[in-house]
Amino acid sequence: MLPMSDTRSSRIKPMTLNFGPQHPAAHGVMRLILEMSGEVIERIDPHIGLLHRGTEKLIEYKTYLQALPYFDRLDYVSPMSQEHAYSLCVEKLLQCVVPPRAKYIRVIFCELTRVLNHLLNVSSQALDTGATTPLLWMFEERERLLSFYERASGARFHAAYIRPGGIAADVPDGLLDDIHAFTESFPKLLDDVDGLLTENSIWKQRNVDIGVVSKAQALDWGFSGPMLRACGIPWDLRKSQPYEIYETLDFKVPVGSNGDCYDRYLVRMAEMRESISIIRQCLNGIPEGPVKTDDRKIAPPRREELKYSMEALIHHFKLFSEGYKVPEGEAYVAVEAPKGEFGVYIVSDGTNRPYRCRIRAPGFAHLQAIDAMARGHMLADLTAIIGSLDIVFGEIDR
């Protein structure tokens, strides 16, 4: 037996620990290889690819309309934001003009999607740190939002509602009134969650000064969305590079100051309030009119036309069997998705299928910083850090 003073025994070898992919706080199929010194994290090596489906390659074999549903299945917590980015990119290549009513409905549903995403993130982050009540309250409101999705598109998650040229169909009667009623009652829930968490001493101990990221680090890592704004950088694509009707809307960009888990929570809570304000403005200003472009080479004709017009029937058949040809060229469009900058880059060779489609997922940039964020923290802090990252592996692995 070696004496305790022996140099060989005084060097503690780091313990290697597997975190996930079957772990309730892993938020999907995340696998982390942790190097631990006791309870302190010395290094993290994230392993990705367990949900890789080859989405970018699959898109090359589909027409532009058939490729749309793949985007619902990337970040499956906020599907319409990704449909929106893809549709805007295709419209940029087609130089297609979308009717004003369709733009308003797109923005309404994109902001509902932001609320949908942040409700899940805040409630699951709270659950990961031991608070169960917010999950029960917030999931009740998520159900209401998913019912709006279902009434508009027929599906709770994979909506395929925002399409190149406009939207799939106008909203059913009474839906906009119900969304307005939701905007009236929803702030009460935010006030209740605020009262439960924001000044709660246990919540603050678990999140303040945990996973701190400086402004310079956030820019170096390629952060965007709430992760970037929590560091104090007021970068929001809806303000800096406005698309659709955002330049006509009045809203603030919430920012943090410390760049820690607590600030990321505060930013997301404030963003939900701003989204409600945006939805109200859209509901008050939404015009009447068509919801699809009148170019029948891009959007299908109205169903009534199919009963008496042979030309409409031919357009409908050609559109859904062959699709439309997109002019040769390339385009990149990014939208302010709930998790950050979601970008779509399409190269067209003039056929009815994309030659190349590159997807820029915000969660990919955020996950790569987990080693720097968690180093030196306790193992118990890792769940708070992962919760504040707001990652979904559908978009990271693609």
UniProtKB/Swiss-Prot annotation:
- Which Cys residues form disulphide pairs? none
Q: Where in the cell is it found?
A: Cell inner membrane
The enzyme's E.C. designation: 7.1.1.-
Q: Does the keyword section mention Transport?
A: yes
**Primary location:** membrane
- What GO cellular component term, any one, is given? plasma membrane
Look up and give the membrane topology term. Peripheral membrane protein
Fetch the InterPro entries from UniProt: NADH_Q_OxRdtase_suD (IPR001135), NADH_UbQ_OxRdtase_49kDa_CS (IPR014029), NDH1_su_D/H (IPR022885), NiFe-Hase_large (IPR029014)
MF-aspect GO terms: NAD binding; NADH:ubiquinone reductase (non-electrogenic) activity; quinone binding
Q: According to the lineage, what is the superkingdom?
A: Bacteria
Subunit note: NDH-1 is composed of 14 different subunits. Subunits NuoB, C, D, E, F, and G constitute the peripheral sector of the complex.
Q: According to its UniProt entry, what is the function of this protein?
A: NDH-1 shuttles electrons from NADH, via FMN and iron-sulfur (Fe-S) centers, to quinones in the respiratory chain. The immediate electron acceptor for the enzyme in this species is believed to be ubiquinone. Couples the redox reaction to proton translocation (for every two electrons transferred, four hydrogen ions are translocated across the cytoplasmic membrane), and thus conserves the redox energy in a proton gradient.
Name the protein family.
Belongs to the complex I 49 kDa subunit family.
Q: What is this protein called?
A: NADH-quinone oxidoreductase subunit D
Which species is listed as the source? Anaplasma marginale (strain St. Maries)
